[in-house]
Curated annotation (Swiss-Prot):
Record keywords, A-Z: Cell membrane, Cell projection, Coiled coil, Cytoplasm, Cytoskeleton, DNA-binding, Membrane, Nucleus, Phosphoprotein
Function: Phosphatidylinositol 3,4,5-trisphosphate-dependent guanine nucleotide exchange factor (GEF) which, independently of RAS, transduces signals from tyrosine kinase receptors to RAC. It also mediates signaling of membrane ruffling. Regulates the actin cytoskeleton as an effector or adapter protein in response to agonist stimulated phosphatidylinositol (3,4)-bisphosphate production and cell protrusion.
Annotated organism of origin: Homo sapiens (Human)
Coiled coil region boundaries: 316-539
Entry's localization field: Cytoplasm; Cell membrane; Nucleus; Cell projection, Lamellipodium
Recorded GO MF terms: ATP binding; cadherin binding; calcium ion binding; DNA binding; guanyl-nucleotide exchange factor activity
Domain of life per record: Eukaryota
This protein's name: Switch-associated protein 70
Length: 585
């Protein structure tokens, strides 16, 4: 019922749109009354003018909407429709209302009757959305059907070219554009009017009148058992047979249901290509013109009975429904894809905005980075200059330090040299001291020797003086004794001479001892001077290597060369020794 209602609404929409003169979506009440009356008449629905007046009591015009004509149409007409009206009459009534306003004035290769059939086919194949259009897939399906019915070859490349231009302009064709497309012969070149008209009629019978198969066959009568040629028309639940193909004189129907069956019969009584259609109360024996026709009819009837068992619609309606569901699915997928694309676009825009914000931030960051880089470069240049200065200064300091290290090394070497020299000086001082000590010992020995010699000389001198005195005394003695004394004198003179010689020898030895003493004294002075010189050098070097520290509180003797290397007691001892030496000399 829902599918029937949708098909009826499409034709009514054309009629209502034709009555809408100013395209406002509204039609006057008087026109709606006429339309409603005509609809009730062709649809065999009781007409209630009071309900119409009541429905549009406050409106001069009624738009086709939920608030306008549609609620009345649904409630008082469409809900009461039964499947007992003439669909062709209904469609022709709606066609009559809209054809004059919409059909093109350009000359067409088809008749108005053919245009009407195309219009009805359009309503069957169009989408369930308003305004009604037929999409490219259904146009291709219809054109293929027509080309097949005309016995021509389908030009897919030509349609693809047309489809490209078609898709670029709009989503589909209106009924009048479809009529003009078929009527101008674009896809039926080389075909005459009659062939095109027959093809349109064949497709109309299949799609609109649900004619599954039709053709001439022989039928055996039930009463007289004779064979008569009839025009058979197979529909989803019935096989009708007529005197001729003009369908004016109907001779009977074969009602089909799920209990019917079709069987092939062998040839008999001179009749060939026989088959049997068994129904609940009757059996129909039919003869086809040839085996191919026989097989086609058996297959068609068998398929029809099978569809009745399954409760399925006719193949063309089922195919249309599948195509619609496929398009609906594709549309849903496309809408889902578009929704996803919109979401992706929104996300992309959001990402773009984020990227733009990030780009701006990056630009700002780049600007800041450039500024920072500039500052960094400037700072780097400054740091480099400062580092260069620091490096130069460090090099200078390093050079100075190296010079200082070299100087310190030189000073250390000099210090070590002075230490070595000082050690040598100490050794030489010790040698000088040893020489001085030895000289003192030699001086002491010489002095003792000199003292001994002086003592011996004094003793000899005293002895000589004694002898001289004795000699003088002897002179004063007697002359007698003088000779004796002379002799003694001679002896004594000899002894004196010997003593004088000894004295001279002692004097010589004393002089030699004195010379030796002078030499020793000179050596002592030289040793003393040498010792003093080495002591001064040692003191000088000790002063160079001595750490600076608080001086001693004890008083020191000061010489021409600085502090003395000996104490006051040592000085007194030396003065005492010197005086003794002077006294001895």
């Amino acid at each position: 019922m829902g599918s029937l209602k949708e098909e009826l609404l499409k034709a009514i929409w054309h009629a209502f749109t034709a009555l809408d003169q100013d395209h406002s979506g509204k039609v006057s009440k008087s026109q709606l009354k006429v339309l409603s009356h005509n609809l009730c008449t062709v649809l065999k629905v009781p007409h209630d003018p009071v309900a119409l007046e009541e429905h549009f009591r406050d409106d001069d015009e009624g738009p086709v909407s939920n608030q306008g004509y549609m609620p009345y149409l649904n409630r008082f007409i469409l809900e009461k429709v039964q499947d007992n009206f003439d669909k062709i009459e209904f469609n022709r009534m709606c066609w009559t209302l809209c054809v004059k306003k919409n059909l093109t004035k350009n000359p067409l290769l088809i008749t108005e009757e053919d245009a009407f059939k195309i219009w009805v086919i359009f309503n069957f194949l169009s989408e369930d959305k308003y305004p009604l259009i037929i999409v490219s897939e259904e146009i291709e399906y219809l054109l293929k059907k027509l080309t097949e019915a005309m016995g021509g070859g389908w030009q897919q490349e030509q349609f693809e070219h047309y489809k490209i231009n078609f898709d670029d302009s709009k989503n589909g064709l209106s009924a009048w554009e479809l009529i003009e497309l078929i009527g101008n012969g674009q896809f039926s070149k080389g075909m005459d009017r009659q062939t095109v008209s027959m093809a349109i009629n064949e497709v109309f019978n299949e799609l609109i009148l649900d004619v599954l198969k039709q053709g001439y066959m022989m039928k055996k009568g039930h009463r007289r058992k004779n064979w008569t040629e009839r025009w058979f028309v197979l529909k989803p639940n019935i096989i009708s047979y007529y005197v001729s193909e003009d369908l004016k004189d109907k001779k009977g129907d074969i009602l089909l249901d799920e209990n019917c069956c079709v069987e092939s019969l062998p040839d008999k009584d001179g009749k060939k290509c026989l088959f049997l259609v068994k129904c609940f109360d009757k059996t129909f024996e039919i003869s086809a013109s040839d085996k191919k026709k026989k097989q086609e009819w058996i297959q068609a009837i068998h398929s029809t009975i099978h569809l009745l068992k399954l409760g399925s619609p006719p193949p063309h309606k089922e195919a249309r429904q599948r195509r619609k569901e496929l398009r609906k699915k594709q549309l849903a997928e496309q809408e889902e894809l578009e929704r996803q694309m919109k979401e992706l676009q929104a996300a992309n825009e959001s990402k773009q905005q984020e990227l733009e914000a990030v780009r701006k931030k990056l630009e700002e960051a780049a600007s800041r980075a450039a500024e920072e880089e500039k500052k960094r470069l400037q700072t780097q240049v400054e740091l480099q200059a400062r580092f260069s200065t620091e490096l130069e200064r460090e090099k200078l300091i390093r050079q100075q330090m190296e010079e200082q290290v070299a100087q310190k090394s030189s000073e250390l070497e000099q210090y070590l040299q002075r230490v070595r020299e000082l050690e040598d000086m100490y050794l030489k001082l010790q040698e000088a001291l040893e020489d001085e000590r030895q000289a003192r010992q030699d001086e002491e020995t010489v002095r003792k020797l000199q003292a001994r010699l002086l003592e011996e000389e004094s003793s000899k001198r005293a002895e000589l003086e004694k002898w001289h005195l004795e000699q003088q005394q002897a002179i004063q003695t007697t002359e007698a004794e003088k000779q004796e004394l002379e002799n003694q004198r001679v002896l004594k003179e000899q002894a004196l001479q010997e003593a004088m010689e000894q004295l001279e020898q002692l004097e010589l030895e004393r002089k030699q001892a004195l010379e030796q003493y002078e030499e020793v004294k000179k050596k002592l002075e030289m040793a003393t001077n040498k010792t003093k010189s080495w002591k001064d050098k040692v003191a000088h070097h000790e002063g160079l290597i001595r750490l600076i520290e608080p001086g001693s509180k004890n008083p020191h003797l000061i010489t021409n060369w600085g502090p003395a290397a000996f104490t006051e007691a040592e000085l007194e001892e030396r003065e005492k020794n010197w005086k003794e030496k002077k006294t001895t000399e």
